[in-house]
Amino acid sequence: MNTQPQFQLKKETLFSETETTNSKQLAILKANFPQCFDKNGAFIQEKLLEIVKSSDVELSKESYSLNWLGKSYARLLANLPPKTLLSEDKDHNQREENKNSQNLLIKGDNLEVLKHMVNAYSEKVKMIYIDPPYNTGKDGFAYNDDRKFTPEQLSDLAGIDLDEAKRILEFTTNGSSSHSAWLTFIYPRLYIARELLREDGVIFISIDENELNQLKTICDEIFGEANFIENIVWNKRIPKNDKGIGNIHEYILAYAKNNEISKEFLMRKDGIDDVYQFIEKLKKEKVPLDKAEQQLKKFYSSNGYDRGITLYNCLNEDYRPWGKINMSWPNADSFGPTYEVLHPLTNNPVKIPDRGWRWKEGTFNHIAKRIDGKYADIKKLHDGSVICGGIWFASTENTQPSSVKFLDEVEEFLLRSIISTKSDGGVEVENLFGGKGYFSYPKPTSLIKTLFGSVKTEDKDIYLDFFAGSGTTAHGILELNIEDGRKRNFICVQLDEETDKKKQAYKEGYKSIFNIT
């Protein structure tokens, strides 16, 4: 991913102690509800309640929240200004291949980078995907913080007692991997990430069972419970060397900035582009349709496609794949209309489904182009069957007719709450680096493309990943742009974290993860 403009953080003494735990929230209240503050800046609760009540907003008497040692500190971190400067990597950016890129790769602590981004990218990011540390106990997560507070400073800024401040500073400086440490780490990053999202923006967060429940609760707090979209299950692999129960899935929490705007999420059927490429090959080779259909069925079988694709195993004269859709009444607890349908070749009535037809007779006649009892358009197929308008008939009346549906008419459907991907992220990274696996369990580009491709996009929409890792997000966006002709832009952030000296990546000169990104 090193063909993108690069920026890096430089540490400076820019720390300000004027911010407190709720500085941003208070500023928003003052800007939007100035009438709720007196001349001394004191908040007048009753006036805000008057506004709420006059707007017919129901007041809830029930609420809950997740509290942990360090939450007050996490909220303070979200409000503090950056303590660094962002500088350009001029040598890299002036290279000819990087000059005109609209994408950004930033090296540094993502919390600091996010704080800088608020100035230029507030409410400008279309979509965020992050794959943060899962805190499994084996992924190397340990909270480390170089912000040099004294207990007295932290107590004053966060509004907590001195003893709590001391306990917080103890785990922030000692590399803790507790639930509290992880929550303190992730909370301010998500809080600022929300500020970057557009009103129609969406965030996807990968996680596993170790922190799922905690993450869901703080996301409800940050993004609003009403803006929760789905907890997507990602079927990732066949279990390998698992004990007890084979773990084959992870989770992806999805939240909208405003769920009233972000309504529909679509996904392309997995593997459909490979199907189109195979059919195009058959067409170029001018394989006869009957043999082409046989080869297509074998292709489906050998690649394990699901019924959403394998149903479309017929080809028309232009090699456009289509399938036969059952015309029986779909509801088991009721019956559909029954009427006589004549076969277009034999003129004998076809068998009526046990529960009746799916459509009324008028609808059937319209789709079949049947006018005054006669079919206006009859196309004979290579196997003796025929198509009349949008209805398929077998060569005799002994088989029930089916409606005709083309694969390209149904290649997209609503994003499912369970996503399965055929590709392996580890193999993809190995292929990029000559068969060498420098990353453990990277996400496959197909997953990123499914998520990012699910939302309607415009040219120059910005996509953000502030746990860039192997660069899968950037890779996926570049592939999406090639496939659909869009011009999405990405911003990827990665800490200049040293690679494990025992790993192959370090031995071959990749001293930091950023070098690989």
Residue ranges and their predicted role:
Residues Y121-V125, R194-G201, E221-N231, S454-D461, ...:
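Secondary-structure transition/capping motifs at alpha-helix termini
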Residues K240-T310:
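Flexible, glycine-/basic-rich loop-and-beta segments that form/coincide
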Residues W68, N110, F141-L154, L183, ...:
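Conserved S-adenosyl-L-methionine
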Residues I168-N231, I491, F514-I516:
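Conserved Class I SAM-dependent methyltransferase catalytic core
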Residues M117, G137-R147, K216-T217, N231, ...:
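Short, solvent-exposed loop/turn and secondary-structure capping segments
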